[in-house]
UniProtKB/Swiss-Prot annotation:
GO terms for biological process: ceramide biosynthetic process; sphingosine biosynthetic process. This is Serine palmitoyltransferase 1. Pfam families: Aminotran_1_2. InterPro entries: Aminotransferase_I/II_large, AON_synthase_class-II, PyrdxlP-dep_Trfase, PyrdxlP-dep_Trfase_major, PyrdxlP-dep_Trfase_small. Component of serine palmitoyltransferase (SPT), which catalyzes the committed step in the synthesis of sphingolipids, the condensation of serine with palmitoyl CoA to form the long chain base 3-ketosphinganine. It comes from Schizosaccharomyces pombe (strain 972 / ATCC 24843). Its cofactor is pyridoxal 5'-phosphate. PANTHER family: CLASS II AMINOTRANSFERASE/8-AMINO-7-OXONONANOATE SYNTHASE, SERINE PALMITOYLTRANSFERASE 1.
């Protein structure tokens, strides 16, 4: 027996008419037979299932195409004009920079302004001054021939290179400078960077990556610290210029490699020729022997020793009689003794060419101005010819200051007797760090008032790995006379006595 429901019959009839209508409309569209055939084969002519899915399709289209309804924000609070003004008046913005410390205020207050870079010049107010704070160790910044060559190049090539060396920044002047540096030191190749500071901070990460090992002097300069930080390498520090501690660390690493059968990695020892923070000299002979024994490569930063050490200024390799090829990577500065600009890295051809595509500072920085490149290779030419006499003069004047300093009861120095950078530190270690800074700054000001410019070694203490005792930094140059050096040594002693008496500081040593 079959039952009939008129309502459902009407709905079903209406549905069939609708489907027939849309079916005819669908026939007009290209590819509709394929769709209809797919529907029939998929749902086996089940109209109810097709109807339900059609409703879902209509609902989805409605949901996507409908206009979004904005709901009222329950957290919105409407303020009156008076309340807004009160909130604005009460608001205290945070300062963009932290308030200056007492030390920073003292530093900003006591910055001298000079008329020129010469060793004998004037302050901006016209008072004569002898500059013992300049890194112009060989007095080449005042060399007339170098100045004339630099000016002529400036007129020919313009001020800047206006592009990185790898694109269009390299000029024939740069190529000659690289060739002259390599020839002067006695290595295969050299590469020139636009800034001295960024040279070693770029060279280290170019060769050392995550998983490699760096054994570094704990008192290394800030540029080295930045380089090893960028490299993300495993780092071990040895005590400053302590070869026994260095050998202990190398042996520990070797034992660890053997014990755990670790894979072979790149391993470097990093140190300075003359320490920027202490002025003392590393034992290159011993460190080369250790790096050969334990199969390490050596990165030697000669920023302060190139142009100041050795018979003709070739650096520590010449000073100790070590073949320059025994040092894999030699870093040097062109801004000190050579009176130019930038820095360089010298060594094997393979090592140098690797940096042209991997040295970040070489790739992304504009090339060294051509005029500074010319000044540097003209200075190298002078060193090649007259370096022997110039270096003898520099060493004798450094030794003279050391001799006069030995009579000073307030200061001691860790600087090597042949180093032109001399750090003077208080013998009394009980004086607090900040008080030492204030005392040294006052001594500097008193010396400037007497016509001698010296400087306190300044560092960003919060960024330094090791806190170094404050010091006066004296820079000796061949342009200084023996009388000036003797007078400065006596003046520092006199002014220190005045400052100690003024602040009632009792020298405990």
């Amino acid at each position: 027996m079959s039952y009939s429901y008129p309502f459902f019959d009407d709905v079903y009839a209406y549905y069939n008419q609708t489907v027939t209508f849309f079916g005819k409309a669908l026939d007009v569209l290209p590819g509709s037979p394929i769709v209809k055939r797919y529907i029939k084969s998929s749902y086996q002519n089940d109209p109810l299932r097709t109807f339900i899915e059609f409703l879902l399709l209509v609902f989805a289209a409605y949901y996507v195409l409908r206009k979004p309804r904005t709901s009222p924000d329950n957290n919105y609070v409407e303020f009156t004009e008076k309340e807004i003004n009160e909130l604005v008046d009460d608001w205290k913005p945070e300062p963009l920079v932290a308030e200056l410390t007492d030390v920073e205020k003292l530093e900003l207050k006591s910055i001298p302004v000079l008329e020129s870079v010469h060793l004998h010049t004037k302050l901006i107010d016209g008072r004569p001054i002898t500059n013992f704070a300049s890194f112009n160790f060989l007095d080449l910044a005042e060399n007339k021939h170098i100045t004339e060559c630099a000016v002529a190049t400036l007129r020919e090539c313009g001020l800047g290179a206006c592009g990185p060396p790898g694109f269009y920044g390299t000029q024939d002047k740069h190529l000659r400078l690289e060739k002259d540096i390599a020839s002067f030191i006695g290595v295969e190749r050299a590469i020139v960077y636009a800034q001295s500071f960024q040279t070693i901070s770029s060279v280290i990460p170019a060769f050392s990556k995550r998983g490699d090992i760096l054994v570094v002097d704990e008192a290394c300069n800030f540029a080295i610290q930045k380089g090893i930080q960028i490299s993300r390498t495993t780092i071990r520090y040895f005590k400053h210029n302590n070869m026994k501690d260095l050998e202990r660390i190398l042996q520990e690493l070797e034992d660890d490699f053997v014990k755990h059968n670790r894979p072979l990695t790149r391993r470097f020892i990093i140190t300075e020729g003359i320490s920027e923070n202490y002025g003392d000299m590393v034992d290159l002979t011993k460190i080369v022997a250790l790096k050969k024994k334990y199969k390490y490569r050596l990165i030697l930063d000669e920023t302060w020793s190139f142009g100041t050490c050795g018979r003709t200024g070739k650096g520590l390799t010449e000073h100790f009689g070590v073949p320059p090829t025994d040092v894999e990577i030699i870093i040097g500065s062109l801004t000190t003794s050579l009176a130019g600009g930038g820095g360089f890295c010298a060594g094997s051809e393979l090592m140098v060419e690797h940096q042209r595509l991997s040295g970040m500072a070489y790739i992304y920085s504009a090339a060294l101005p051509a005029s500074l490149a010319v000044a540097a290779y003209e200075a190298i030419s002078i060193l090649s010819r007259d370096g022997g006499s110039m270096l003898n003069d520099l060493r004798s004047k450094s030794a003279l200051f050391h001799a006069k300093l030995s009579r000073n009861k307030f200061f001691e120095t860790s600087s090597d007797i042949e180093s032109p950078i001399i750090h003077l530190r208080f013998k009394d270690k009980d004086i607090s760090h900040d008080k030492q800074v204030f005392l040294l700054e006052e001594i500097v000001e008193l010396c400037i008032a007497e016509g001698f410019l010296i400087a306190r070694a300044k560092r960003v203490e919060s960024l330094e790995r090791v806190k170094v005792q404050p010091s006066l930094r004296i820079c000796i140059s061949t342009g200084h006379s023996a009388e000036e050096i003797e007078k400065l040594a006596l003046l520092i002693k006199e002014k220190t006595e005045i400052v100690f008496d003024k602040h009632k500081v009792i020298n405990q040593v």
